[in-house]
Amino acid sequence: MVCIRRATVDDLLAMQACNLMCLPENYQMKYYLYHILSWPQLLYVAEDYNGRIVGYVLAKMEEESNECHGHITSLAVLRTHRKLGLATKLMTAAQAAMEQVYEAEYVSLHVRRSNRAAFNLYTETLGYKINDVEAKYYADGEDAYDMRKNLKGKQNHHHAHGHHHHHGGGCCSGDAKVVETAQAVDGKAVSK
């Protein structure tokens, strides 16, 4: 059995190892730390019954934008654990957090033109649409599809529930809650 849960600072090395095994796009540890300290609600891992991380999603909110939107930085599932719906569950968890915590209007991501499996997951299962093609986006010169999926965002959010409730923080409202959370996560890491 594999469970999907929010990532912690303690998961970052395993997430990086999973990334290195699965993808040609790799990141330094400080980039993972930047994500978890800035947007702790948006990182999820798939953990097997032995406590091993077998997949993850690394996501963030785009700050330099007039529209509040999330971005999927990286998604990976180990080859041994594919075809179990884990990528869909990881993506769904991150998208829901973007919507609930940050009131994101849409989610964006990039995918290699040649990556048919990922492209099919995004379009057929998760409802993403091609927004643009970015020529030579990847280091090896391959083009990327810039894809987007609309979320309810601010405009429909409260009406959909039929009642009003307050959400803490967000890229489009005050960031106080997010900073508090990041400091708490940071404090946890320092005090170990």
UniProtKB/Swiss-Prot annotation:
Protease among keywords: no
Specify one Pfam family: Acetyltransf_1
Source superkingdom: Eukaryota
GO terms in the biological process aspect are: embryo development ending in seed dormancy; response to water deprivation
Give the protein's biological function.
Catalytic subunit of the NatA N-alpha-acetyltransferase complex. Required for male gametocyte development, embryogenesis, suspensor development and the formation of the quiescent center (QC) in the root meristem. Involved in plant immunity through the regulation of SNC1 and RPM1 stability.
KW ATP-binding (keyword) present? no
Protein known as? N-terminal acetyltransferase A complex catalytic subunit NAA10
Q: Which organism is it from?
A: Arabidopsis thaliana (Mouse-ear cress)
Q: What is its EC number?
A: 2.3.1.255
Q: Name one GO molecular function term.
A: mRNA binding
Q: Which residues form the N-acetyltransferase domain?
A: 2-152
- Tissue and organ distribution: Expressed in leaves, roots, shoots and flowers.
Quaternary structure, per UniProt, is:
Part of the NatA complex. Interacts with NAA15.
- GO cellular component terms given for this protein: cytosol; NatA complex; plastid
Which gene specifies this protein's sequence? NAA10
- What's the catalysed reaction? N-terminal glycyl-[protein] + acetyl-CoA = N-terminal N(alpha)-acetylglycyl-[protein] + CoA + H(+); N-terminal L-alanyl-[protein] + acetyl-CoA = N-terminal N(alpha)-acetyl-L-alanyl-[protein] + CoA + H(+); N-terminal L-seryl-[protein] + acetyl-CoA = N-terminal N(alpha)-acetyl-L-seryl-[protein] + CoA + H(+); N-terminal L-valyl-[protein] + acetyl-CoA = N-terminal N(alpha)-acetyl-L-valyl-[protein] + CoA + H(+)
**Which cysteine pairs are joined by S-S bonds?**
none
**UniProt entry keywords in alphabetical sequence:** Acyltransferase, Transferase
Where are the annotated coiled coils located?
A: none
Q: Which family does it belong to?
A: Belongs to the acetyltransferase family. ARD1 subfamily.
For the null mutant, the annotation states: Embryo lethal when homozygous.
Induction of the gene: Down-regulated upon abscisic acid treatment.
CDD domains noted in UniProt: NAT_SF
Matching PROSITE patterns: GNAT
